[in-house]
Amino acid sequence: GCQFAAYDDRNAQMTLWDEEFCGALAERGHFVIRFDNRDVGLSTKFDHAGVPNVAAMMKRGADRSAAPYTLDDMADDAAGLLDALGLESAHVCGASMGGMIAQTVAYRHAGKTRSLISIMSSTGNPELPPPTPEAMKVLMTRPPADRAGAIETSLRAARVIGSPGFPIDEERLRRRAGATYDRAFTPLGT
């Protein structure tokens, strides 16, 4: 079957990819690959590099040279995972910053990319309109360290970035956010 690699947002773990969605892909013959990006979940932590100011780096013309690593590095990680799994190529999919990583995989590792699916993402072009202030506020706010606060932060983010045409299932989201917290809470993940 086809390989389908899924990348997620900056401090989101692989567990945020819906099990039913991934299961439906698998039932259709896809080998679904989900993984935690650097500094997130159960992946390698780069604590020695410090915590970058992501909001400042998102500003137009911002100097990103102080970042401990780049989208290129994260795309190379993804391509390396395909190599480690013995896979020549995959359909690459990412949401939010994961979409930016997927785009970077597609241009840095074109031979490994069967197709590109970029969900609610950006090219990073500074001429594009920025996110709304409400979205920036909720996305740039680090969740509190306690489980209940982290779950509520996830719900707030879902309400802001979700579509009014597709209401969120709050109980389902609470369960998934709680399971993600229990697996490996990494609020400073980038």
Task: Go through the PLM ranges and name each one.
Residues F31, E88-H91, K112-S115:
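Structural signature of beta-strand start/N-cap positions in the alpha/beta core
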Residues M57-Y69, A135-P144:
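Short glycine/proline- and acidic residue-enriched helix-loop micro-motifs
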Residues Q103, Y107, R114-A145:
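Flexible "cap/lid" loop of the alpha/beta hydrolase fold
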Residues G94, G98, A102:
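Gly/Ala-rich beta-loop-alpha elbow adjacent to hydrolase catalytic centers
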Residues M74, V92-G94, I119:
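Short beta-strand immediately N-terminal to the catalytic nucleophile in serine-hydrolase-like folds
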Residues P131-T190:
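Alpha/beta-hydrolase
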